[in-house]
UniProtKB/Swiss-Prot annotation:
It comes from Archaeoglobus fulgidus (strain ATCC 49558 / DSM 4304 / JCM 9628 / NBRC 100126 / VC-16). Its main location: membrane. It comes from the Archaea. This is Uncharacterized protein AF_0095. The chain crosses the membrane at residues 15-37. It is a single-pass membrane protein. Keywords: Membrane, Transmembrane, Transmembrane helix.
Length: 108
């Protein structure tokens, strides 16, 4: 067996991946409930010591004005998208039904 065969490289690289996951990503998901620290809208401004209070509290976005406005605007935008999609579908449905009604009238 050679010293640096593919199985050895695979074991070394997978152990590095496991070490990074176990020490960095897993605690971040447990403590911060996901990528909270990497979210640019999670806290206002730069991350300081008082920002961790928001990230660890039950409702982390209550006292942060920028994030709450960002979430509200996102909710409004997504609801607008849903409403416009529904309107588009209903108008297409009515157009299709109108076309079928005219075909029925001409055939009758």
């Amino acid at each position: 067996m050679e010293r640096w065969d593919p199985l050895t490289w695979h074991c070394i690289i997978s152990s590095y991946y496991f070490y990074i996951f176990w020490n960095f990503f897993l605690p971040m998901f447990i403590v911060y409930r996901g990528f909270g620290l990497l979210d640019p809208f999670a806290v206002k401004g730069r991350y300081t010591s008082d920002c961790y209070i928001f990230l660890l509290s039950e409702e982390p976005f209550e006292n942060v004005t920028h994030c709450s406005s960002q979430r509200q605007s996102w909710a409004l935008w997504s609801s607008h998208q849903r409403i416009s999609r529904l309107q588009r579908l209903t108008t297409e449905h009515h157009k299709a039904n109108r076309g079928q009604a005219t075909i029925r009238k001409t055939l009758a």
